[in-house]
Amino acid sequence: MSTKNFRVSDGDWICPDKKCGNVNFARRTSCNRCGREKTTEAKMMKAGGTEIGKTLAEKSRGLFSANDWQCKTCGNVNWARRSECNMCNTPKYAKLEERTGYGGGFNERENVEYIEREESDGEYDEFGRKKKKYRGKPVGPASILKEVEDKESEGEDEEDEDGDLSKYKLDEDEDEDDADLSKYNLDASEEEDTNKKKKSNRRSRSKSRSSHSRSSSRSSSHSSSRSRSRSHSRSSSSSRSRSRSSSREHSRSRGSKSRSSSRSYRGSSTPRKRSYSSSRSSSSPERSKKRSRSRSSSSGDRKKRRSRSRSPERRRRSSSGSSHSGSRTSSKKK
């Protein structure tokens, strides 16, 4: 069979004999070269591409020939001499892979092989790793270690059973009951109690004294602070009273001055001077109050003076009237 006219179709199989390796058609049950029968070991062939044929070659107008083949995976058209695809490297004739299902995909769980694993009590597991319970122990044969441990445990049990009981004093309570009590001073306990009471009383007294002294010092400090605050308040009150008295004296002196000024300006009949003095007095509220007082006093003085001035005029008039009447009577007598 020439290689030029060799075409592989799906289902063709390769002879299982390594020396032969002939590719047989799918319809054959035995090898065409060596006559060996077809078995399950025979690998099936798979065509990675198909020839395009004459019709497609004519449509390409001389670009491709009828023997060129088209890849099944990527669809690229390759020359006839190529054994692999130029794009995806898929072989033109390949062996059919076995569908075991171990790698996933088609027929994934059909024929699954379960590995039977035996759990052993050995030092190492199935992967050759040392188990955790044996990691900290010294390296050695397991049988020897077990024998040594068994011997040690048996020896300890025998020692516990045959041990002397003399070290355990079982009659110790009875001996204590029958022992002499002469070595114990029973009266010493009472003396110790009295001494303890005295010491406690002394301590309580010293504590009470210290507390009393602390309280007295605190009270003295409080009283001193209070006296200081009182003296401070008194001094502040005295300073306040002084300031008040000085302000009163100052106001009185100002009032007397205003009164004297008002008296000096009484004789003048011009209203301008009075308005001038009133404008000066209105500069402050205190001056206005004092001026009002001085005005009231000046008005009272004016009334008194007017009444006084009128009274001598009346006297004069009365005296003149009396003199006229006397002269009239004297003239009548004449």
UniProtKB/Swiss-Prot annotation:
**GO biological process per UniProt:** RNA processing
Q: Which family does it belong to?
A: Belongs to the ZRANB2 family.
Query: To which species is this protein native?
Result: Gallus gallus (Chicken)
Stretches for region Disordered: 117-334
Spell out the Basic residues composition-biased ranges. Answer: 196-212, 302-318
Give start-end positions of each zinc finger (RanBP2-type). 9-40, 65-94
Q: Which SMART domains match?
A: ZnF_RBZ (SM00547)
Bias class Low complexity marks the residues at: 213-224, 258-285, 319-334
Give start-end positions of Acidic residues composition bias: 150-163
This entry's Gene Ontology molecular function terms read: lipopolysaccharide binding; RNA binding; zinc ion binding
* A GO-annotated cellular component: nucleus
Q: Where in the cell is it found?
A: Nucleus
Q: Which domain of life is it from?
A: Eukaryota
Domain remark text: The RanBP2-type zinc fingers mediate binding to RNA.
Q: What does this protein do?
A: May regulate alternative splicing by interfering with constitutive 5'-splice site selection.
Q: Which gene encodes it?
A: ZRANB2
Q: Which Pfam family, an example, fits this chain?
A: Zn_ribbon_RanBP
UniProt main location, coarse: nucleus
TM regions (residue ranges) = none
The UniProt keywords, alphabetically, are:
Metal-binding, Nucleus, Phosphoprotein, Repeat, RNA-binding, Zinc, Zinc-finger
* Protein name as annotated: Zinc finger Ran-binding domain-containing protein 2
Q: Which InterPro entries does the annotation name? A: Znf_RanBP2, Znf_RanBP2_sf, ZRANB2
